[in-house]
């Protein structure tokens, strides 16, 4: 065909001529391509056409010309195949493949796709050359060529079933390629190729992934997709469950009348499977038998020997892995290898099941249960070993272990083949309720085997013994077993029933598992009424009625008539020992809370009680009537006016005089001021009303308060009787409340409780002040509420001669002491703050009051008007805390009685020098003991000095540390003048803590105990004496960091060291601690590859691992200090910022991974502290500080900072 030849020659000439227009070339190419598509290509035109195509594909000036060349080549190959003249293709294959290899890595996607298609077309014609080209492309350096070649392999495998085994090794190698695109393509190509591959190929793939050290994320992705595909296929191919096999009906008429569904309901409930696991476990699929054998071989070492801290976790993980394998395909596809592997690990599995770790033991028991349910008869050879183990476990004292053993035994019996040894093990077990369920399981699952093997007599003996057992729980369990036995062998059950006693028969008939229970109950109801009177239930009811009647008669006989004018008539029943006194006294005070203009004649009278009841809020109150004990023994009756809670003297033989004097004049009275109606609710209405919620005062939370103790207040509060005229010699005895004066307050503080009527006088009990005085003593107290502007002064109260004093009581000493008169904040309610100590005003003694002055009777100081001048009224909570153990509290000051101003040294008064210690909240405790020179204090000081010497000489024992800890927590003044021993003890403990273990000449266990005690002593001083230890915080922090080098991170003392460092960071001086830690870590020798071996360091004695632990903890501490500096608004100086940045850059090159990890966290904290806002990167102080870091380290920092920002 001359036309095609002419066109081909013209095209070849145009392609070879550079000056030919591109459009002309394309036109000529289109003509040739059209002739190829529609006409036969003569042999003389084939070689020139190949040359034209080669020139066009290799052209670089026109992409359109290249695409036309690929299109023409595709049509040309198809035409030659139709003409069956492919020899020219094989002859030109070498040139063509070289050209296509170049185009596989072309920048244009269209060119790569065209070359990929051409290779697919050429593969049937010259497969060797094409596969060689693909191998070269996958091994080459061009990333695009690698992507295209792997895509070609996947395409050819899916369309042409191309074997890919020859390419798998290179694809796995490409999983670790430097180019991320190549890794991603290789990952998806491996998944696509191996999804339909056989299981042994997948197993080999996993081994190659491990051997080539493929990164974990890619390997996990591939494994998960392959396992997911296998799981999905298994679920799709799973056959439907077989229909349930119905058991044959019972042969006899008696068995046909029984109802098993209703008669053994409790047994069915007991056999429900254990609850589903909280943690879902995915099955593990095994692809080859060799892989399964390798897994069992790797599991063996942790199961050997005894359980220890080093192998228990591996045992638990292996047990969980076995359960996952059991859920997979291994038991079905490789049963022989699986059973053999389980047998080799059986001893270790039983060790796991018998461990004392509850979760681990449960895991082992569940594994055995699942083995029994899955392998069933395959575990018959191990049945005796398993039963011996788990029957023994059923006797464990731990309930969870016993239940696990019971469930496991039932699972084993239910699923294995029966033999006589199983029945013997069950019969040999101790008689208990669990054995009853095992017998039921044997009857249900193996009834035919038991009957034919001669085990029926043994079963009968077990059930008869259980039904007649002495334990009621065992009898109850075996009744259900009996009726299960009766379902299968009714004749034997009836024969056994006839041999039982009447009690056992009755219990069996009434058992809920009895199918004929309704018939038995109807028969029993038809019995004569005689059984109702003589039966056990009727006898118990009659006995109960008789006891109740006797109780009512006793209560009626023991009733005591009400005592008029009784002091106990208004007392509520005692609720507890701690509130006994308070409840009685509040009831007495409540009777005086009347709204009338004047008080009633007597505070203890019944009329006053009734008036208080009328003012009570709501019905149902505790004061809704006269309250007395329901049963009062006659021998405890007291006189009508006795106060059961009054204070009595020991030894004087006198009784408390009447609250209402017998000689009180009826007409002559002293004029007194009338108290107006109170604007607040009376105490009786809030103390005894159940409808009032106890609302705490806000002053306890938000304001600085001075807490007043009102112990025993209003316990014997009585209304003042009308006093006689001035000329009448009247002997008046009044039971007086225990009242403290209110100390003077600074303008910035308010009293905790402004009592009603504190501007009036009060009467004091002479017994409280002077224990040896007569009973006719009356004390007049002047105005208690003083103006805040009054100056502070101290005048000791006038007291009597010591000859009048008996043994001092705490309350008497409180009133005599100027300290207790002015500062009573250590008692009763406590606040976290305290106003400066002041002295109480003068108190004139009324011992020698002139007879013509008359008796002054004043209003109840607790029920009067509230002072109008008080702006912040603080009410005491109705059901708040009660001041108990006053005597003990008086000797021991409170831990929270000093304000925060005292901690900072801003106290308004110069306190005497005394022992002081700080609590964990920073408040200071002062103990102003007058016995600083007593023997105990001197002894403790000598012991402290001896302890310090022993610590310095490294001969101290642990009991000495504990003794010093007790002295530190005590209130004794053990530190001496200017607290010189305090610093000596702290520094000695710090030096002892830093000493290496090798330098202490004792055993390592004892050294560890000594270090722990030394650290406990240091922590006690830090927490209790925070003000004194403030200057040592940086020193202690450095010691803690250096000591950390001696201990592993998992040791207990390491945890205590970290806790101590956290407390110092939280409460210490941030700037000082920051500088100290910086100096410490800067002195550490660098562990970078470029570090000099002669680097300067003060810690050169530290080993490599110890130095790493110190550096890691120091970096974490620096990060915490930087964070807390931001919280405290502490500015980092430029010098500190520069040093921190240099440290960060230095630690980036550290050889230890833990140090680098801690350094990253430290850099993140530093960035959050000093980084500039977004958009001001040029002013960012963080990047300037770390400017010396290498580029890869800066990139790593940027990654973690972006990750933190995204989180």
Swiss-Prot record:
Subcellular location(s) of the protein: Cytoplasm, Cytoskeleton; Nucleus; Cytoplasm, Cytoskeleton, Spindle
Pfam families for the chain: CLASP_N
Any one Gene Ontology molecular-function term assigned to this protein's record: microtubule binding
Record's compositionally biased regions (Polar residues): 605-624, 653-672, 684-710, 895-905, 919-928
Biased amino acid composition, Basic and acidic residues: 869-878
A Gene Ontology BP annotation from the UniProt entry: mitotic spindle assembly
InterPro entries to which the protein is assigned, alphabetical: ARM-like, ARM-type_fold, CLASP_N_dom, TOG
Biased composition, class Low complexity, residue ranges: 576-594, 711-724, 791-806
Chief location: cytoplasm
Keywords: Cell cycle, Cell division, Cytoplasm, Cytoskeleton, Microtubule, Mitosis, Nucleus, Repeat
Coiled-coil stretches: none
Region (Disordered): 504-525, 549-730, 789-856, 869-928, 1086-1105
Entry GO CC: cytoplasmic microtubule; microtubule organizing center; mitotic spindle; mitotic spindle midzone; nucleus; spindle microtubule
Function according to Swiss-Prot or TrEMBL: Microtubule binding protein that promotes the stabilization of dynamic microtubules. Required for mitotic spindle formation.
Family: Belongs to the CLASP family.
Subunit structure comment from the entry: Interacts with microtubules.
Protein's name according to its UniProt entry: Protein STU1
Source organism per UniProt: Phaeosphaeria nodorum (strain SN15 / ATCC MYA-4574 / FGSC 10173) (Glume blotch fungus)
């Amino acid at each position: 065909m001359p036309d095609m030849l002419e066109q081909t020659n013209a095209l070849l000439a145009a392609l070879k001529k550079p000056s030919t227009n591109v459009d002309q070339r394309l036109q000529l190419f289109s003509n040739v391509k059209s002739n190829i598509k529609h006409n036969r290509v003569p042999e003389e035109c084939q070689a020139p056409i190949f040359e034209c195509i080669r020139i066009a594909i290799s052209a670089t000036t026109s992409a359109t010309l290249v695409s036309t060349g690929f299109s023409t080549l595709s049509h040309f190959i198809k035409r030659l195949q139709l003409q069956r003249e492919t020899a020219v293709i094989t002859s030109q294959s070498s040139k063509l493949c070289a050209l296509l290899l170049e185009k596989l890595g072309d920048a244009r996607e269209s060119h790569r796709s065209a070359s990929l298609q051409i290779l697919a077309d050429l593969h049937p014609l010259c497969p060797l050359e094409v596969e060689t080209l693909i191998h070269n492309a996958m091994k080459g350096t061009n990333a695009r060529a690698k992507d295209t070649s792997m895509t070609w392999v996947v395409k050819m495998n899916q369309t042409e079933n191309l074997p890919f085994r020859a390419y798998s090794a290179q694809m796995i190698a490409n999983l670790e390629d430097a180019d991320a695109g190549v890794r991603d393509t290789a990952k998806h190509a491996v998944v696509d190729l191996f999804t339909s591959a056989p299981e042994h190929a997948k197993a080999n793939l996993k081994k190659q992934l491990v051997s080539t050290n493929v990164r974990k994320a890619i390997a996990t992705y591939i494994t998960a997709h392959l396992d997911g595909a296998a799981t999905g296929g298994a679920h799709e191919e799973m056959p439907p469950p077989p229909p349930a096999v119905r058991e044959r009906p019972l042969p006899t008429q008696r068995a046909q009348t029984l109802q098993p569904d209703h008669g053994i309901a409790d047994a069915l409930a007991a056999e429900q499977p254990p609850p589903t696991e909280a943690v879902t476990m995915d099955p593990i699929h095994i692809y080859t038998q060799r892989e399964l054998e390798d897994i069992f071989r790797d599991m063996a070492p942790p199961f050997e020997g005894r359980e220890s801290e080093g192998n228990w976790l591996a045992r638990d993980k292996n047990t969980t892995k076995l359960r996952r394998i059991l859920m997979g395909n291994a038991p079905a596809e490789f049963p022989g290898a699986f059973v053999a592997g389980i047998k080799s690990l059986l001893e270790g599995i039983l060790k796991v099941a018998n461990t004392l770790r509850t979760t681990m033991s449960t895991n082992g028991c569940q594994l055995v249960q699942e083995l029994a349910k899955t392998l069933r008869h395959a575990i018959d050879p191990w049945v005796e070993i398993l039963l011996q183990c788990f029957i023994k476990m059923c006797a464990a004292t731990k309930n969870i272990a016993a239940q696990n053993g019971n469930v496991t035994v039932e699972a084993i019996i239910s699923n294995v083949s029966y033999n006589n040894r199983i029945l013997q093990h069950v019969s040999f077990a101790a008689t208990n309720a669990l054995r009853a369920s095992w017998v039921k399981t044997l009857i249900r699952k193996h009834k035919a085997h038991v009957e034919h093997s001669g085990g029926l007599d043994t079963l009968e003996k077990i059930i008869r013994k259980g039904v007649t057992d002495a334990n009621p729980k065992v009898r109850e369990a075996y009744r259900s077993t009996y009726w299960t036995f009766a379902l299968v062998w009714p004749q034997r059950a009836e024969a056994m029933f006839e041999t039982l006693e009447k009690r056992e028969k009755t219990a069996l008939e009434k058992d809920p598992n009895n199918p004929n229970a309704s018939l038995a109950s109807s028969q029993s109801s038809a019995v004569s009424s005689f059984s109702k009177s003589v039966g056990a239930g009727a006898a118990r009811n009659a006995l109960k009625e008789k006891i109740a009647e006797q109780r009512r008669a006793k209560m009626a006989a023991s009733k005591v008539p009400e005592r008029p004018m009784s002091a106990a008539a208004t007392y509520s029943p005692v609720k507890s020992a701690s509130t006994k006194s308070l409840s009685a006294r509040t009831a007495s005070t409540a009777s005086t809370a009347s709204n009338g203009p004047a008080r009633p004649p007597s505070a203890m009278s019944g009329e006053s009680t009734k008036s208080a009841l009328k003012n009570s809020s709501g019905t149902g109150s505790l004061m809704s009537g006269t309250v007395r004990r329901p049963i009062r023994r006659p021998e405890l009756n007291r006189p009508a006016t006795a106060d059961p809670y009054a204070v009595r003297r020991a030894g004087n033989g006198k009784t408390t005089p009447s609250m209402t004097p017998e000689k009180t004049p009826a007409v002559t009275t002293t004029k007194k001021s009338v108290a107006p109606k109170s604007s607040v609710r009376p105490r009786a209405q809030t103390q005894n009303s159940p409808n009032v919620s106890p609302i705490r005062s806000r002053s306890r939370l938000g304001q600085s308060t001075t807490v007043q103790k009102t112990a025993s207040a209003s316990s014997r509060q009585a209304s003042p009787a009308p006093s006689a005229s001035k000329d009448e010699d009247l002997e008046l005895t009044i039971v007086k409340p225990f009242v403290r004066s209110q100390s003077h307050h600074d303008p910035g503080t308010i009293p905790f409780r402004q009592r009603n009527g504190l501007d009036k006088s009060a009467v004091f009990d002479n017994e409280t002040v002077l224990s040896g005085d007569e009973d006719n003593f009356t004390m007049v107290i002047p105005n208690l509420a003083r103006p805040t502007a009054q100056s502070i002064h101290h005048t000791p109260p006038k007291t009597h001669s010591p000859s009048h004093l008996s043994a001092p009581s705490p309350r008497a000493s409180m009133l005599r002491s100027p300290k207790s008169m002015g500062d009573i904040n250590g008692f009763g309610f406590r606040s976290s703050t305290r106003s400066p100590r002041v002295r109480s005003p003068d108190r004139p003694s009324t011992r020698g009051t002139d007879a013509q002055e008359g008796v002054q009777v004043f209003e109840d100081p607790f029920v009067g008007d509230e002072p109008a001048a008080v702006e912040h009224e603080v009410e005491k909570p109705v059901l708040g805390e009660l001041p108990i153990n006053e005597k003990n509290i008086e000797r021991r000051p409170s831990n929270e009685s000093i304000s925060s101003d005292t901690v900072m040294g801003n106290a308004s008064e110069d306190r005497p020098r005394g022992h002081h210690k700080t609590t964990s909240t920073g408040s200071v405790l002062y103990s102003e003991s007058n016995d600083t020179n007593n023997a105990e204090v001197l002894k403790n000081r000598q012991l402290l000095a001896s302890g310090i010497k022993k610590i310095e000489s490294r001969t101290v024992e642990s009991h000495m540390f504990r003794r010093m800890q007790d002295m530190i927590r005590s209130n004794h003044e053990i530190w001496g003048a200017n607290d010189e021993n305090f610093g000596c003890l702290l520094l000695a403990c710090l030096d002892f803590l830093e000493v290496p273990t090798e330098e202490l000449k004792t055993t390592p266990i004892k050294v560890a105990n000594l270090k722990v005690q030394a650290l406990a002593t240091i922590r006690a001083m830090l927490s209790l004496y925070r003000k004194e230890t403030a200057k040592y915080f940086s020193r202690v922090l450095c010691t803690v960091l250096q000591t950390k080098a001696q201990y592993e991170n998992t040791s207990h003392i390491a945890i205590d060291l970290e806790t101590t460092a956290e407390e110092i960071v939280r409460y210490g001086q941030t700037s000082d601690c920051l500088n100290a830690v910086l100096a410490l870590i800067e002195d550490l020798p660098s562990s970078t590859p470029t570090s000099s071996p002669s680097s300067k360091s003060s810690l050169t004695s530290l080993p490599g691992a110890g130095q790493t632990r110190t550096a890691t903890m120091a970096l974490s501490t620096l990060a915490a200090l930087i964070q807390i500096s931001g919280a405290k608004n502490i500015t980092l100086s430029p010098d500190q910022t520069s040093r921190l940045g240099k440290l960060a850059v230095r630690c980036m090159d550290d050889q230890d991974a833990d140090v680098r990890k801690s350094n990253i966290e430290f850099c993140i904290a530093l960035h959050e502290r000093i980084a500039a806002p977004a958009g001001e990167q040029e002013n960012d102080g963080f990047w300037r500080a770390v400017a010396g870091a290498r580029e890869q380290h800066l990139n790593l920092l940027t990654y973690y900072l972006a990750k933190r920002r995204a989180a």
